[in-house]
Regions:
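Conserved catalytic core of two-metal-ion nucleotidyltransferases
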Residues: 1-36, 44, 56-164, 169-197
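Short, His- and charge-rich active-site/binding loops that engage polyanionic ligands
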Residues: 43-49
Length: 197
């Protein structure tokens, strides 16, 4: 994935170790080619899942202190964090930058720009549940969004239904909404930025 960040609005989540470089961000997930051959596609997907797990373990270890602060001692979450950090300590023998480079090479193994399927390996549902038909997914149309013209996949209804369920147009009850832990968020700067648009 690609991260677009602004330093004008300070924001820091659990995985932001360097407090000097904290800003509000959006993630843009890369659409990757995947193999038409089912065996090669499966191997690509298993590798993607393995690299995602290793990268997350290394990040857990790097941010162990901040993660430990959000979990009660001896809770299931605390045990989960400790186990991921132990694995992260082992994987950290190789620097995160090297793991990231290897992962990037692996997810982009398929060079066929006309493959039948594409995947979003960095997406929330990961490789196997984010497989899409190229002809449907990679064709785009323009729609109005927030007063601007934006290019979106022609098959956005299928995409949103896969990610959020068939009722994706309805705002879920507060208890069912996705939550993100923020250690720091400059709400005043965020509100000013929104008002100025």
């Amino acid at each position: 994935k690609i991260r677009i960040e602004t330093k004008k609005i300070r924001a820091r989540d659990l995985f932001e170790k360097d407090e000097r470089n904290c800003g509000l961000w959006i993630d843009i997930f890369i659409i990757e080619n995947t193999f038409d051959n089912a065996l090669l596609r499966t191997l690509q997907g298993i590798g993607v899942m393995g690299f995602r797990y290793i990268l997350s373990c290394v990040k857990f270890k790097r941010n162990e202190e901040a993660l430990s602060e959000v979990a009660k001692p001896d809770s299931p979450l605390s045990k989960y964090i400790r186990s991921r950090c132990r694995l992260g300590a082992i994987f950290s023998v190789i620097p995160l930058s090297v793991w990231t480079c290897l992962s990037t090479k692996w997810v982009s193994l398929c060079k066929n720009e006309n493959s039948r399927l594409v995947s979003i390996p960095g997406g929330r549902l990961q490789f196997f549940r984010e497989l899409y038909c190229r002809d449907d997914f990679c064709n785009v149309e323009r729609i109005e969004f927030e007063g601007r013209q934006a290019k979106v996949t022609c098959d956005y209804k299928t995409y949103f239904a896969i990610l959020y369920g068939n009722n994706y147009t309805k705002i879920p009850p507060e208890a069912d909404r996705e939550k993100h832990i923020m250690l720091e968020l400059d709400k005043k700067a965020l509100e000013e930025a929104v008002r100025s648009k």
